[in-house]
Amino acid sequence: MVHGTRVSVRAAFLACLLACFAMLLLPGSEAELPVEDFTHAVIGEEFTATWCVYCPSAAENLYKVWRPKSEYPDDPYYDDQFFFVALITDVNDKADDRAGDYPDFTGYPTVYFDGGDEKVEGGQSDTSNYEQAIDNCGSRADTDISLRISMQHLGDDRIAVQAYITWNEDGGFGDPTFDGYIRAYIVEPISRYNNYDNEPYHFGFLDYAFDQEVELDSHEEVILETVWVGGDHTDSNGDDFSDISYDNLNIFVSFFNNEQASADDYALQTAFAIPPDVNFWFPTEVLSDTASLTGTASSPRTTIGSVEYKVDDGEWLLAEGTEEFDLQLDTTAYANGDHELLLRISN
């Protein structure tokens, strides 16, 4: 619509949802260590193999610790202070390589917490050993690191990923920087691989978005960016990941100590990117005047902080509401023709 004259603006909007996430610290837990007493979120690396008889019991008890309290009120729960990844070594060479980073790794299942600060071996009849390991790691006094991770679906098997890292301490005169190592695990919550009981793994590892050293200056944010393409990566059988489903992808990222003077390589912080549940109707018919486009959004681990939208290459605009949102789209601001509408949901 131009100068008040009613014309058709066809909104062939691309249903492209950008999900941006940062780690939030939410109170409330029935585990031994209250969530508010955690110094950082804890990562568990579950080393497993599809032929391993005792691995399913380990996986299920890890999952009991992770899954939402609202759905499973009798299970322990750490809100968003604990995440784990299943590193299935007989189907993924990078998972097998990661096992080689631990000199004391001897068999399956083995779960390393925070890069080896705690280790639990063997099948498990309950969650107690995992809870104790998580509590011990979560209470560890350590370097103050802020960490965020974002992911956006670019269509098909292409995922844009950004990591934001800040060292929140003053550097010393002799050592003004901090050396770390970042691993961003791309996982499928419902894995394409089945365990010995013929059930899908929880958070089965596919590949790293980032797997590299990082040098931090005091109080300065470092931003890493990449575009991960599933078809460019394969498992041990030579099968690529071009068939990924964005709704079945999470990214868990951990920043590890890599200082030469340090006696350990423990994880200092962990964050996550999980696509939200979004119900939104992307219009395909002709729009005019000011169009009201509504939807809902929810996240299994945190609350929704904001909903933003933009048209084509314009600026991001804030929608009204969060869990229930309303986009007031002024079609008079755009020329006649097809346009691209993008949503960005942040926790």
Model-derived regions: residue spans:
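Secretory targeting signatures
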Residues: M1-V35, C52, G295
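Local sequence-structure signature of Cys/Sec-based thiol-disulfide redox active-site neighborhoods
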Residues: L33-Y72
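Conserved beta-strand and immediately adjacent loop positions that scaffold enzyme active sites
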Residues: I43, T110, Y181-R183, F252, ...
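Boundary/junction segments of secreted and surface-exposed precursor proteins
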Residues: A22-I43, N279-T290
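Long, low-complexity serine/threonine/glycine- and acidic-rich segments characteristic of extracellular
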Residues: P276-N347
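Short, well-ordered amphipathic alpha-helices
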Residues: S29, L62-R67, T226-V229
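Short, conserved sequence motifs used for protein processing/export or organelle targeting and
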Residues: T39, P76-N279
